[in-house]
Amino acid sequence: MERAKMAEESLETAAEHERILREIESTDTACIGPTLRSVYDGEEHGRFMEKLETRIRNHDREIEKMCNFHYQGFVDSITELLKVRGEAQKLKNQVTDTNRKLQHEGKELVIAMEELKQCRLQQRNISATVDKLMLCLPVLEMYSKLRDQMKTKRHYPALKTLEHLEHTYLPQVSHYRFCKVMVDNIPKLREEIKDVSMSDLKDFLESIRKHSDKIGETAMKQAQQQRNLDNIVLQQPRIGSKRKSKKDVYTIFDAEVESTSPKSEQDSGILDVEDEEDDEEVPGAQDLVDFSPVYRCLHIYSVLGARETFENYYRKQRRKQARLVLQPPSNMHETLDGYRKYFNQIVGFFVVEDHILHTTQGLVNRAYIDELWEMALSKTIAALRTHSSYCSDPNLVLDLKNLIVLFADTLQVYGFPVNQLFDMLLEIRDQYSETLLKKWAGVFRNILDSDNYSPIPVTSEETYKKVVGQFPFQDIELEKQPFPKKFPFSEFVPKVYNQIKEFIYACLKFSEDLHLSSTEVDDMIRKSTNLLLTRTLSNSLQNVIKRKNIGLTELVQIIINTTHLEKSCKYLEEFITNITNVLPETVHTTKLYGTTTFKDARHAAEEEIYTNLNQKIDQFLQLADYDWMTGDLDNKASDYLVDLIAFLRSTFAVFTHLPGKVAQTACMSACKHLATSLMQLLLEAEVRQLTLGALQQFNLDVRECEQFARSGPVPGFQEDTLQLAFIDLRQLLDLFIQWDWSTYLADYGQPNCKYLRVNPVTALTLLEKMKDTSRKNNMFAQFRKNERDKQKLIDTVAKQLRGLISSHHS
């Protein structure tokens, strides 16, 4: 068994060695290592070496056999090789020589080929470079275009170019470093465009703020031209024509919008517009403004996704500007130009906002505009109320009213509600009336102060017609009189009448363009005219009448003048009716109070005449110098009284043109005052004693007064009517001079008694003065029987008079 086993193992080993040998024979030498490693790893490498030696010997025997077999052929080959050797050397030399010649001859070709190689390489590089540049060139061109657009402030096209550059061109060459720089710079460029466009917008806003005055002035000129065209040419209602005007305005606005699109290259600000076809045509407000900065900035912010930020900024800045515009200068009320500039700025502001509203989508909306307008309206009205209250010149107030109307009409063209402005004008109308009244107070004062208070003399028909043309006066008798002749009134009558008409015209001027009905205009004029008559003119007349240095002649003329002015009131009524076309019979029509005014003035003048006459009488009476203790009689009236009567006669002679009752009342009043003053003179306390002679002299003066009364200084009195003014004096003097006490005491209290007008108190007072005189007249009088009897009689009469007085009081 063991032998069999060993034999089997020996066979396996031999087979393995055989395989290794075959592998060594067939394998490349470089790869024999692993094979040999397997032999050394085994345990039979000795036997393998034996096998290997055996195999080598076998191969050596085969090689030897082969060499022996081919030896003769080898010898022959060597012999032939030796023969060829010489030829080979010769050929070698020829080849070497040929090679040398070829190298020499091909050197230039090699150089040319090297140059060609370099050229080919350069050409390939250039071609590649051109291809790359052609790919990069649009990017560079777009970037250059972007820079040019930003340099020329074409920001919106620059933003569009930046978008194309970012999304279309840069992705194609994104692997280049300069492209990466561009990509990194794009946000900065966007911010730069954003900042520059915002800077342009700020410049635009600042320019608009500075030039709002010019814009508003132009818009108001357009409105004025349109209104003139409506009134003169078209004869159409103003509202309708204004709507047409607004349509025309927006036609021009639309054209201007096209020229100021976001791609417009115009700068911001105010444009200098010149009309080559018609130099006189007023340029439209929109023609003065380049709105492209707003449009560009709006589009830029919209593209950048910041439209809301832009809208908020724009509205905030415009609100600030609105507050500045609406703040009036402190001295605005001093001149009309101050108001005009204020209105121009407001109109300019809202013209711009209205244009922005209609040419942009949502930058401003109607609610925003309405909010601004409400604020502007309230502030404007408050400012006008404050500053107009300082105006004392009616011409300035009227010009202000016309300016406010134009201001309102201009803004109404752009769709702004202006009813509150017209309501405020009604308030200013009252102030205008007050300033007119103050002005006319001065006018009336100058007229009344400069008047000579003498009838107007006329020497020719032309002069006569001129006066009649100024004042409605008709007098057939005066017309028949030859020249020269006089009007009954003085110059202030036609002057005052014409000034009243001028006042009415001034009131009418203010009512124009206020959209008032004829009835409202008529009512306004009549109320203002009534104030003029009842307050201003009345006060002026009263001041003249109450003047200290006014004379009776002036007062008489004032009465005559006011009488004629009173008659002219109906013509003033007709005058107002003609200019307002409102009949006086219309319901609620206010009547003129001129008649009352002139009546009151006339009555005041009459009272002043009475007072003046009385004062003159008092002045004459102050000259009275009676010797109450005299016993002599001059048999003539006192000098002062003669002068007084002469004065009264001359005065009443002037009263011929006065109404009869006025002259009669004045004459009666003067006589009564004279009688009363004489009575007071007789009874005054300072006269403690008087004699019968003094009483008789006093009686002569009273007779002079009675003679004056009987002479009829003023026509129209019935017989003895004027003498009744002196009846108290006459009966008192008759009682004492005739010493008719028995009759007086017997008839006292009876209605037909002779001394009915003698008061017992008065009689007692005068009797006491005579009683004291009788007692002290002569120290020996008491020894005379008749004197004693007279004294007893006086005492008796005095006692009886006291009894009458006491019984009367009881």
Swiss-Prot record:
Is Ribonucleoprotein among this UniProt entry's keywords?
Answer: no
Q: Which GO terms describe its biological process?
A: intracellular protein transport; membrane fission; mitotic cytokinesis; vesicle docking involved in exocytosis; vesicle tethering involved in exocytosis
Could you tell me the keywords of this UniProt record? Coiled coil, Exocytosis, Transport
Q: Acidic residues: which segments have biased composition? A: 272-282
- PANTHER family for this protein: EXOCYST COMPLEX COMPONENT 6B, SEC15
Subunit text:
The exocyst complex is composed of SEC3, SEC5, SEC6, SEC8, SEC10, SEC15, EXO70 and EXO84.
- Role description: Component of the exocyst complex involved in the docking of exocytic vesicles with fusion sites on the plasma membrane.
| Name of the protein this chain belongs to | Exocyst complex component 6B
Its taxonomic placement starts with:
Eukaryota, Metazoa, Chordata, Craniata, Vertebrata
Q: Which gene encodes it?
A: Exoc6b
